[in-house]
Amino acid sequence: MTYVLDLKRSFLDACTWLIGDNFRDLGSVLWVPLPILSLVIVATLGVLVIVWLERKISAGVQQRVGPEYGGALGLLQPLADGLKLVFKEDVVPAKSDTWLFTLGPAVVVIPIFLAYLVVPFGQQLIIADLRIGIFFWIAISSIAPIGLLMSGYGSNNKYSFLGGLRAAAQSISYELPLAICVLSVCLLADSLSTVDIVESQSSWGILTWNIWRQPIGFVAFLIAALAECERLPFDLPEAEEELVAGYQTEYTGMKFGLFYVGSYVNLLVSGCFVTVLYLGGWHGPFAIDGILPDSPPFQVLDAFLGITWTLLKTFLFLFAAILTRWTLPRVRIDQLLDLGWKFLLPVSLGNLLLTASLKLLF
């Protein structure tokens, strides 16, 4: 399509129509926090959906019913969980480092929300189309383990401290293969922009998605993403049988709730980047660019379809991640590190070399 839906221009035009030309600058000021606020609300609602899916899928795997009393099909159960955490007492251990103990959850959650700045839900449906958007995500996601280490050390608890150390070791081990797999995709797209990466997969629909051009990188990225999210079988930093609850052991109330939200938001953003890098982003399986007329109603339809396809692909990844959690056993810490350093890192480097060689030849 030649013209795409520009939300900012549409918002400013609506402000001009409602309150006059003299207040167009006011509309520009109001626009600044609006996308960020909308994204935070949508991400939080996404967490509620994931929590409900986790409960229902785990119940299906274990042949149970799952939540059914909290509203229709148990849809209000995640909301009840959140309200319960809000009203719990916020306990700070007596001999803990209060500053580190308090700042830790915020340092974990804030970078995860910032990653949504570069997630495209459509050609213009992105908050910040940075030229280095994909590496902005990798850089910003590397901050979260620092918060986990702060939380573990500040708790003055041996189990919490060990959980924080495990989180740091796990992040370092799997950040490298993750970044190298991303670099292979960027070589194919000739860009580090998330929008350009999606556009490079739009020529022939599903046939040009990077999952077919980068099958090795896709599998390596999938494993590394699950490890970065600390999902089973890679949840060593909070292994109940070994570390009680890891770095979360001393936390209660909303501070514990921040870890809870951060874990699921991180899983959601990882699903978004799997979609962007390997599954064609907002594009459907069939190439329809240029088919729809260039009129405002069809621009809105195109934007709606883009958001729908992005969310469908993202929740497909989430379904696989949840199913993996309830079907595979936890690995040992030595197996976790061996998988990262002795398997994924050489495989991702070989995939990068192969991609660069084919790029030079063809």
Curated annotation (Swiss-Prot):
Q: Which GO terms describe its cellular component?
A: chloroplast thylakoid membrane
**Known EC number(s)?**
7.1.1.-
The molecular function terms of the Gene Ontology recorded here are:
NADH dehydrogenase activity; oxidoreductase activity, acting on NAD(P)H, quinone or similar compound as acceptor; quinone binding
Q: Which reaction does it catalyse?
A: a plastoquinone + NADH + (n+1) H(+)(in) = a plastoquinol + NAD(+) + n H(+)(out); a plastoquinone + NADPH + (n+1) H(+)(in) = a plastoquinol + NADP(+) + n H(+)(out)
Location of this chain's protein in the cell? Plastid, Chloroplast thylakoid membrane
The alphabetized UniProt keywords are: Chloroplast, Membrane, NAD, NADP, Plastid, Plastoquinone, Quinone, Thylakoid, Translocase, Transmembrane, Transmembrane helix
Q: Where does this protein come from, organism-wise? A: Nephroselmis olivacea (Green alga)
Q: Main subcellular localization, coarse class?
A: plastid
Q: Which family does it belong to?
A: Belongs to the complex I subunit 1 family.
- Stated name of the protein: NAD(P)H-quinone oxidoreductase subunit 1, chloroplastic
The UniProt function text for this chain reads: NDH shuttles electrons from NAD(P)H:plastoquinone, via FMN and iron-sulfur (Fe-S) centers, to quinones in the photosynthetic chain and possibly in a chloroplast respiratory chain. The immediate electron acceptor for the enzyme in this species is believed to be plastoquinone. Couples the redox reaction to proton translocation, and thus conserves the redox energy in a proton gradient.
Q: What class of enzyme is it?
A: translocase
Could you name the domain of life of the organism this protein comes from? Eukaryota
Quaternary structure per UniProt? NDH is composed of at least 16 different subunits, 5 of which are encoded in the nucleus.
- Topology in membrane: Multi-pass membrane protein
Record has Thylakoid as a keyword: yes
Q: Which InterPro entries match?
A: NADH_UbQ_OxRdtase_su1/FPO, NADH_UbQ_OxRdtase_su1_CS
Q: Name one GO biological process term.
A: photosynthesis, light reaction
Q: Which residues cross the membrane?
A: 31-51, 99-119, 132-152, 178-198, 206-226, 268-288, 303-323, 336-356
Question: Where does the signal peptide begin and end?
Answer: none
